[in-house]
Structures are given as structure tokens and as C-alpha cells.
């Protein structure tokens, strides 16, 4: 208790140090309201929280906020530490590299080139690419990828995940990132389905657009983006330089992991600048929000015309995915938005399509959970209609003896869910999300992340049979507890996703059961077979695992990834998450596969 009190006292003293601007009494009162109205979707056992308490709860070292009202930035403020060891506080000038918000500004760069007739958004990207060409194959079904596809994540491309690179590492070129390289654990960017079919988020597509910009303009990406996008918007504190310039280092927020430990090297280098390499401030991002709101109404054109701005904010294949932004409808009000997450950082912004409201929030933390609480508080204080309507619920504590009978896997509407225990409580997994369980009574539970309320059901003998589901009082098809995975006939991606979740939580026996069923349902699905090998491996059944690995190394390409690439990628993931590195090295050695650097 004493430590917590000291931490909060320290933060309060830091707040005094970082008061960069003196506001009117009315604005100061609004700031205090925002600071004391933080809340999740469900407010449990009481009232909204205080910003310092919530920072402490989530291990967030520092954050920065800027708020827009009536097309003006009404206040901006920093909280906590930009660097805890250096005792360097967050100010409104502190720079963050939150991640995918970069995609919004990359889209503006493409749209500016289209507005200037330097390119066409509906033309094959290979028309403009010079230093690298996209290798079409049969999966694209003869259809060509356009810039509209890339910016709206509808090009049918693989993801291209990246954690960034340490400041001492050798940084790959974009061309090296775009082409498969099993030795370095890079899967490259290739077609997974035909362009324009549906939405699939892809960093890879955005990286291709970055290459395209440099090929067309014959300028370094960061120079073109500063001169033609950031500077016209008045975002003069921001930049895309990777690594950052030496004279900016003292303005950079140090990144922190979700547990509050400092990121090695303080920040990573991100060669995928368009996808996640923008260093910026909430104040600068709010300048973009305001200009976009005004340009949308035809009242400004610092960068884009009204016509091009409307195109920027218009969804294409997916009803919410526009060009560089997502459209979030709350009641009758639409917001353009993008969230973001890099290792050590996270952020989000919202701008209303009408009315001139907005907010941008950045954290130097990999933990994103505080972001919606701050956005909800701003929306409440500034009365954004329908943006946030809290649900008030009570929670009771249940003994493990009751909890244990609920653990297991469930089936609802052709989807799978799982209930399991972690050190800090019981969790509900579905759709790839781990969500903590809160109980209103012995059988009814709810989650912050899901609107569906759930009530366990049991038979006459008291055995749990499933749970009832409802939203806003409307009954949904119930979930049934799975007693025999061998009878399941669900989509293979559901089986595979659940199995991967079980592997992550070291429930290898259960994973094996589901993956065996997956092979019956989809015998040619390479990822299912490889995941079965992983399950055997970590379940101390080495011979079974190595036999499957060896056989699959001769299997044909599935989704343009060979078994070798899958094994390499998955092992890199397992290594980062504390799995047995020596065991995986033995597999790679026995299979005569190249061992990636740092393994």
C-alpha cells in the first residue's frame, strides 16, 4: 500500500512539473473531469477511475492526450514519464512511435500523388513499382492489385508482421522484407486470395505502397512525407525518419513492455515506415483531424481537396475500412479512426465526421487497455452522443472449487470458445481474444471485451452443459460444452485457432485432440499438421513431432508458405514467448534446417 501511495504521489508531482500550458478555469475543470472519469465498457463495483490509478493498474509509465472541440485543439497534456530512469517527464512535445496510425498519413501521401495526377488509384501497382515488382500467381486469379486495394487492406495479401529491430541490428531492406527468406524468419508478402474479394489487414500491402512512393518520387520516403504531407498539415514536430535523428533523441518517449519493464535499447528501428514508423505527438495528429474535418466540408484544402478527402473517408470492400482509416459509427455519428501498437508503444485517435470533435492518445506502453478508457472519458465529458454508454455491474468472488467446473471448451454458432485459468484469475477465449471473466452471481458472467452476457447451464446431476447467451435482452443460440472433439464439424480455422490458443497456454493434450480432428476434416491443411507437430514436441513426444515435421518438409506450398517457413516463423514466436529454445534448436538441427540468428 505504501509503494502505491508513493507512486501516485510521485505522479502527482510529475504532473506539476509538466504543466506546459495554463488554461482557463473552465478548461482546467474539463481536464480534471477527464482525469477522473476513466472507465471500461463495464464499470464494476463502483465508480469510474482516476488517470493515475489506471496508469498504475496497467503499468503505463507515460501518456499524452490532445482534445479537439469545435474544430480546435482545446487542450493537450502529458502524464508520467517519457523515460523513468532518466526522470524525463512526458510533455506535449514528447514524441511517440505508436505504430499503425502511420498508415493514415501514408494514405494521404498516396492520395496527394493521385490528386497531382502522378498516379491512378485503380491501376495495377506494377505499373508504378520499379525497384521491386509484385509476383502475381494463381491465387490472385488474374486480377491486378491497385493502390485502393492496398490502402483499404483488400488486396488479398499476407500480413508481414514486424516487431521492429534493435538499434544495433542489421536492418533489412524493404525488398528483403517483401520476399520470403526462411533463414531470417521472414515470410515475405504474397497473395492469399484474389484482390477485392474481402478485407484482410496487411502491413505487407502498406509496405508495398511505401516502395511505390519512393519509386515514383525518387525521394527518400521520410523526405517526401514531411514535405508533402506533414508540413502542409502543420505537423512540424513529426517525422518518418528511421532511425530518428540524433537531435530528436531527448524528445523521444522510451518504450515499455506490458509489464512495465523498459524496452531493450529504449526503442526499435522500424524500416516499414509507412506501416508503423511515424514519430509524432497527439497535438500533431489532432491537426490532421481538424484539417480532415474541414476539408470534408469543403472549408479547407491545405492538403487534399474535398473530393479527395471524401474518398479518403469512404469504405471500399469492407463497410468500415476506408483508405488509411476506419469508419466507426456510434449511433448516428461517424468517426474516422485508427488505433496503433508497436513494441513499447500504443495509441488511438478519433475524429467526428461532423461537429468538430476529436481526441488523440498515445502511451509508451505495449498495453493498449488504457486507451479506450481515456477515449470514453473524453467522450463523456464533451458529450459525444452515443460514443460511450457504460454498463454498471457488480462482481462477486467465487472459490476455485466452483470455477473449476466451468473450465473447458465450448461450441456456439459454429465457433469455438475456451475457459481456462491464469495466475490472475479465470479467462474466456473466443475469436482470438483472451478476456477476464467477471461473475455477477455463481452462474452468470460477463467480459469487458464482449457484449454478450452468459449464464452457465447444468443438467439434473449438476454437470455443466454449456451457457446461455444474450445481448441487450435478446436470446442468442446457446453454447454447448464440448465433451468429444472427434465429433466436431466446425470450420478448420476455428479448430486451428483454438489449438494455437491451447498451445500458447501449454495445454498440449487438448491441442492434440483438436488438431487430430482438424486433420480428419482438412487433411491437406499444412498449418494444422505443423501445429500438431508443435503440440507433440512440447508434450514431450519428440519422435512423433519430428516424423511429422520431416514429412511436411516435402509437402507442396500452401498459401505460398512452405513447411520450412512455417516452422521457422512459429519457432521464432515460441522463442519470444519463453518456450524451450534448446528443444527447438534440436529440431532444426535434426531436420538440417538453418538456425535463425539469435536462436
Task: State where each predicted segment sits.
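Terminal, low-structured helical/coil segments at or just beyond the last alpha-helical repeat
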Residues: 561-599
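Short active-site loop at a secondary-structure junction
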Residues: 57-66, 85-149, 191-204, 273-276, ...
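Catalytic loop of the DD-peptidase/beta-lactamase superfamily, centered on the K-T-G motif
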Residues: 20-77, 214-227, 266-496
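Short, surface-exposed loop or secondary-structure junction motifs
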Residues: 79, 83, 137-343, 347-349
Amino acid at each position: 500500500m505504501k509503494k502505491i501511495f508513493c507512486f501516485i504521489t510521485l505522479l502527482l508531482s510529475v504532473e506539476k512539473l509538466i504543466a506546459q500550458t495554463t488554461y482557463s478555469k473552465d478548461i482546467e475543470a474539463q481536464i480534471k473531469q477527464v482525469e477522473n472519469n476513466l472507465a471500461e465498457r463495464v464499470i464494476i463495483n463502483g465508480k469510474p477511475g482516476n488517470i493515475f490509478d489506471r496508469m498504475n493498474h496497467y503499468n503505463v509509465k507515460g501518456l499524452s492526450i490532445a482534445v479537439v472541440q469545435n474544430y480546435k485543439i482545446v487542450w493537450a497534456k502529458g502524464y508520467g514519464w517519457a523515460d523513468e530512469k532518466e526522470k524525463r517527464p512526458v510533455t506535449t512535445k514528447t514524441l511517440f512511435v505508436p505504430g499503425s496510425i502511420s498508415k493514415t498519413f501514408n494514405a494521404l501521401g498516396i492520395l496527394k500523388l493521385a490528386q497531382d495526377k502522378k498516379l491512378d488509384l485503380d491501376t495495377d501497382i506494377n505499373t508504378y513499382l520499379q525497384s521491386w515488382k509484385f509476383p502475381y500467381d494463381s491465387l490472385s486469379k488474374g486480377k491486378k492489385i491497385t493502390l485502393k486495394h492496398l490502402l483499404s487492406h483488400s488486396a488479398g495479401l499476407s500480413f508481414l508482421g514486424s516487431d521492429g529491430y534493435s538499434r544495433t541490428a542489421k536492418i533489412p531492406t524493404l525488398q528483403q522484407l517483401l520476399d520470403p527468406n526462411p533463414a531470417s524468419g521472414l515470410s515475405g508478402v504474397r497473395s492469399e486470395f484474389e484482390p477485392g474479394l474481402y478485407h484482410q489487414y496487411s502491413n505487407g500491402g502498406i509496405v508495398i505502397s511505401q516502395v511505390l512512393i519512393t519509386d515514383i518520387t525518387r525521394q527518400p520516403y521520410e523526405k517526401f512525407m514531411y514535405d508533402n504531407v506533414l508540413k502542409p498539415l502543420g505537423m512540424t514536430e513529426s517525422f518518418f525518419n528511421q532511425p530518428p535523428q540524433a537531435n530528436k533523441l531527448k524528445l523521444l518517449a522510451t518504450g515499455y513492455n506490458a509489464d512495465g519493464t523498459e524496452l531493450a535499447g529504449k526503442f526499435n528501428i522500424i524500416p516499414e515506415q509507412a506501416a508503423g514508423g511515424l514519430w509524432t505527438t497527439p497535438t500533431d495528429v489532432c491537426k490532421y483531424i481538424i484539417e480532415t474535418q474541414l476539408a470534408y466540408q469543403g472549408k479547407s484544402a491545405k492538403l487534399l481537396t474535398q473530393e479527395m478527402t471524401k474518398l479518403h473517408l469512404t469504405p471500399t470492400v469492407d463497410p468500415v475500412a476506408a483508405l488509411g482509416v476506419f469508419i466507426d459509427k456510434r449511433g448516428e455519428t461517424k468517426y474516422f479512426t485508427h488505433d496503433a501498437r508497436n513494441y513499447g508503444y500504443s495509441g488511438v485517435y478519433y475524429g467526428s465526421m461532423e461537429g468538430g470533435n476529436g481526441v488523440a492518445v498515445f502511451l509508451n506502453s505495449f498495453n493498449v487497455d488504457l486507451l479506450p478508457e481515456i477515449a470514453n472519458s473524453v467522450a463523456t465529458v464533451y458529450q459525444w452522443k452515443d460514443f460511450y454508454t457504460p454498463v454498471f455491474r457488480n462482481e462477486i468472488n467465487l472459490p476455485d472449487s466452483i470455477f473449476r467446473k466451468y473450465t473447458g471448451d465450448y461450441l456456439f454458432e459454429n465457433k469455438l470458445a475456451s475457459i481456462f485459468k491464469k495466475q490472475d484469475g479465470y479467462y474466456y477465449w473466443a475469436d482470438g481474444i483472451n478476456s477476464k471473466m467477471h461473475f455477477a452471481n455463481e452462474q452468470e458472467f460477463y467480459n469487458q471485451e464482449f457484449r454478450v452476457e452468459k449464464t452457465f447451464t447444468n443438467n439434473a446431476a449438476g454437470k455443466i452443459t454449456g451457457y446461455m447467451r444474450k445481448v441487450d435482452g435478446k436470446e442468442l443460440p446457446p453454447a454447448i460444452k464440448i465433451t468429444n472433439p472427434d465429433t466436431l464439424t466446425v470450420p478448420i480455422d476455428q479448430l486451428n485457432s483454438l489449438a494455437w490458443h491451447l498451445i500458447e497456454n501449454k495445454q498440449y493434450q487438448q491441442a492434440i485432440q483438436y488438431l487430430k480432428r482438424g486433420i480428419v476434416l482438412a487433411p491437406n491443411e499444412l498449418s494444422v499438421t505443423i501445429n500438431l507437430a508443435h503440440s507433440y514436441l512440447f508434450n514431450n513426444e519428440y519422435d512423433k513431432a519430428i516424423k511429422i515435421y520431416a514429412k511436411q518438409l516435402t509437402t507442396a506450398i500452401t498459401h505460398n508458405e512452405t513447411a520450412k517457413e512455417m516452422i521457422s516463423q512459429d519457432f521464432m514466436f515460441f522463442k519470444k514467448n519463453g518456450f524451450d529454445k534448446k528443444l527447438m534448436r534440436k529440431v532444426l538441427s535434426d531436420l538440417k534446417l538453418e538456425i535463425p540468428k539469435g536462436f
